[in-house]
């Protein structure tokens, strides 16, 4: 009888304790450590799996990785540049272009379909175009601080380095829609950047200003849709001092041997391009592109871009850059895409920085640079 009563009392205590949150099993902190370890292990196994957006599912499924190099043709590519780019991009969804800004020759394109056909909003990389437009139209200059709201002032160098949206929105409002489009077209936006690349598709420029103001065009790139090829051409023109080359991708050793640079046009206001360099270097040294890795002996100049594409809801991470090693320059452009908030311009800058680092490790920049053909000087071009 006493034994039965004891058993009943124990059961009552257990049930009552459970109801009031009293536990008799594994302590909470220990259970948390076990759960955390398990979650970390699971997360590590699907670290690069994209997330589903807008779909309700009872069970999360890790999607298989897509090889960004699948379908690429490596014929005629600089294999050292390609190896550096492939290793830097890894399994991330995106594209990398490596090019010679002094000739327009493409050395490697990783994920060629995205690089040739992926037209997205340029995000803050449009500030390169806006900066030159503002300088050439006399709206801004490099030294003078630009007064913004709340008595805050900022100069061009800091505005580029920190990608200040208010600064460039003000520039856009003063430029007006027609001037913004004019300078965008001068840099090659809305047209093919490459020459004789059959699969390439051009970006586009909206026929009307954004409904939320001109400032969105020059701070976030709203109204423009740009391919990685177009950004590579833009950065190449900045790097070489104002010559917009057609980008060419040789597909054989014969085409490499017979390569002749082709000029599309000379930029109007090219004399102002040197004013962009301190800000583009500052972005890498202390601004939005710090992940690229600053080096005083092998400086990188770049501009990040982070936004969500209005048409596709794709999250974007852009980085357009070039470096200087002695008398050599190399352009590296990165576009990262994702269905989730897992990409950004700073992350893209880290990919580009890894490309440069990989090439330095291969002693790439100690090799003789390919010489530009004199034919480039007599190619037909149009000035804006």
What is each residue range found by the language model?
Residues 1-23:
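Sec-dependent N-terminal signal peptides
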Residues 42-100, 189:
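Beta-lactamase-like hydrolase cores
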Residues 67-76, 113-120, 145-149, 153-158, ...:
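Second-shell loop/turn segments in exported
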Residues 85-89, 104, 118-143, 159, ...:
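Active-site SXXK
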Residues 215-250, 255-262, 286-366:
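Active-site beta-strand/loop architecture of penicillin-binding DD-peptidases
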């Amino acid at each position: 009888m006493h034994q039965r009563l004891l058993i009943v009392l124990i059961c009552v205590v257990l049930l009552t304790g459970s109801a009031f949150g009293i536990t008799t099993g594994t302590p909470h902190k220990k259970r948390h450590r076990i759960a955390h370890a398990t979650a970390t292990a699971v997360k590590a196994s699907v670290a690069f799996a994209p997330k589903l957006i807008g779909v309700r599912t009872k069970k999360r499924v890790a999607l298989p990785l897509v090889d960004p190099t699948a379908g690429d043709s490596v014929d005629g590519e600089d294999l050292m540049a390609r190896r550096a780019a492939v290793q830097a991009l890894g399994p991330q969804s995106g594209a990398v272009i490596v090019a010679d800004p002094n000739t327009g020759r493409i050395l490697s394109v990783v994920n060629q379909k995205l690089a040739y056909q992926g037209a997205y909003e340029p995000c803050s990389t449009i500030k390169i175009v806006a900066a030159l437009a503002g300088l050439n139209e006399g709206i801004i200059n490099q030294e003078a601080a630009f007064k913004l709201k709340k008595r805050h002032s900022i100069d061009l160098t800091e505005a580029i380095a920190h990608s200040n949206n208010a600064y460039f929105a003000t520039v856009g409002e003063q430029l007006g829609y027609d001037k913004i489009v004019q300078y965008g077209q001068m840099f090659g936006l809305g047209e093919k950047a490459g020459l004789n690349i059959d699969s390439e598709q051009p970006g586009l420029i909206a026929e009307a200003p954004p409904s939320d103001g001109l400032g969105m065009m020059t701070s976030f790139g709203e109204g423009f849709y740009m391919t990685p090829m177009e950004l590579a051409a833009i950065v190449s023109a900045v790097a070489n001092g104002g010559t917009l080359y057609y980008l060419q991708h040789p597909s054989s050793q014969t085409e490499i041997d017979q390569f002749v640079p082709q000029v599309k046009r000379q930029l109007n206001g090219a004399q102002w391009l040197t004013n962009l360099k301190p800000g583009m270097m500052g972005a890498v040294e202390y601004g939005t592109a710090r992940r690229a890795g600053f080096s005083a002996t092998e400086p990188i100049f770049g501009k990040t871009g982070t936004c969500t594409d209005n048409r596709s809801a794709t999250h974007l991470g852009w980085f357009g850059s070039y470096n200087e090693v002695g008398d050599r320059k190399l352009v590296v452009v990165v576009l990262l895409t994702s269905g989730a908030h897992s990409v950004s311009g700073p992350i893209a800058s880290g990919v580009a920085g890894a490309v440069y680092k990989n090439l330095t490790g291969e002693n790439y920049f100690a090799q003789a640079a390919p010489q530009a053909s004199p034919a480039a000087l007599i190619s037909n071009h149009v000035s804006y």
